[in-house]
């Protein structure tokens, strides 16, 4: 009788171990981050280490170069962040913050790992000095000035046309 109970007990433990063996790989797979999620975690770390007053939010994410199957292998990343209106000490997620007008733009490069449990990143960010970023500011300011000048010209034409209309004497 005792042998039968030991057999049932052994069978139960075998079943439990089998189920754990099936579930554990699923738990490990569930802990692998996507490329974008890993970058967002890195941006959270950048915001925590930053001495700037406001949070940064992702502006542009370059496509991933290589995605091998090992989540522990560092993956090269490059992305651009921009300053938001949210103070760094806030508990708000940067993704919920609006970009600050004329906020600082930084270009970031480095590596991230996709393993959520042991995730790590090595990222450095510098002020974005790429020419097209400067050109974007130039064209935006030029468009604003042209718009203001156009409004003044239209107003002058209206004033001129009003002066051409014969006036009736009162």
Curated annotation (Swiss-Prot):
An example molecular function term from Gene Ontology annotations: lipopolysaccharide binding
Propeptide: 31-131
Localization (cell): Secreted; Vesicle
Major location category of this protein: secreted
Residue ranges of the region described as Active core: 150-162
Keywords from the named record: Antibiotic, Antimicrobial, Cleavage on pair of basic residues, Disulfide bond, Immunity, Innate immunity, Secreted, Signal
Post-translational modification: Proteolytically cleaved by proteinase PRTN3 into antibacterial peptide LL-37. Proteolytically cleaved by cathepsin CTSG and neutrophil elastase ELANE.
Signal peptide (UniProt feature, chain positions): 1-30
Entry's free-text remark on domains: The cathelin-like domain (CLD), which is the propeptide part, does not seem to exhibit auto-inhibitory function, as it does not inhibit the antibacterial activity of antibacterial peptide LL-37.
Protein family: Belongs to the cathelicidin family.
Name of the protein: Cathelicidin antimicrobial peptide
Organism: Pongo pygmaeus
């Amino acid at each position: 009788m005792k042998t039968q109970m030991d057999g049932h007990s052994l069978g139960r433990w075998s079943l439990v171990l089998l189920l754990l063996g099936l579930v554990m790989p699923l738990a490990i797979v569930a802990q692998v981050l996507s490329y974008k999620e890993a970058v967002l975690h890195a941006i959270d770390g950048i915001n925590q280490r930053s001495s700037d007053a406001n949070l940064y939010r992702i502006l542009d994410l370059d496509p991933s170069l290589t995605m091998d199957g090992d989540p522990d292998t560092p993956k090269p990343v490059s992305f651009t962040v921009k300053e938001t209106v949210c103070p760094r000490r806030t508990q708000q997620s940067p993704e919920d913050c609006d970009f600050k007008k004329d906020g600082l733009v930084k270009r970031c490069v480095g590596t991230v790992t996709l393993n959520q449990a042991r995730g790590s990143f090595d990222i450095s960010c510098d002020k974005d000095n790429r020419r097209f970023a400067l050109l974007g500011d130039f064209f935006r300011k030029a468009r604003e000035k042209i718009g203001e000048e156009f409004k003044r010209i239209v107003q002058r034409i209206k004033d001129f046309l009003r002066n051409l209309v014969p006036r009736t004497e009162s």
